[in-house]
Regions:
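Cell wall/extracellular polymer interaction/catalysis modules
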Residues: 1-115
Length: 115
């Protein structure tokens, strides 16, 4: 799965998330503020993600983000809905659920690319 960040206003980080079946959805994150906890998007890179069964929103959790914990992919429509997480529309989360939710023990790969 690939999250391609695109040129964005200074108050947010916009992106396009492409699922394995080729479907694309817009994403929204906080702006880049040097990976500061709760106020910055996470660095570009390769991450594992898994079904989230204990977090606040319980959709998906991005794992092993250097210097950060509790990074989730969840529903949201504006940067203030995030504390460093990746916000996605409900239709995307449902598509991800149908693709990735079958096995609690599996992890998957998310590649985040900067513009």
């Amino acid at each position: 799965m690939i999250l391609q960040r695109i040129k964005s206003p200074s108050d947010r980080t916009n992106g396009i998330l492409t699922l394995p079946d080729g479907s694309e959805y817009y994403s929204l994150e906080r702006p880049w503020l040097n990976n500061q906890t709760s106020i910055s998007c996470i660095p570009a890179g390769h991450y594992k993600f898994a079904r989230d069964t204990h977090g606040r929103f319980q959709w998906f959790e991005v794992l092993d983000v250097n210097g950060r914990t509790n990074i989730e992919m969840h529903l949201g429509t504006k940067p203030s809905h995030s504390e460093g997480c990746i916000l996605l529309p409900k239709v995307c989360l449902i598509a991800m659920k149908n693709t990735f939710y079958n096995d609690l023990d599996l992890t998957y790969v998310l590649e985040i690319r900067n513009p």
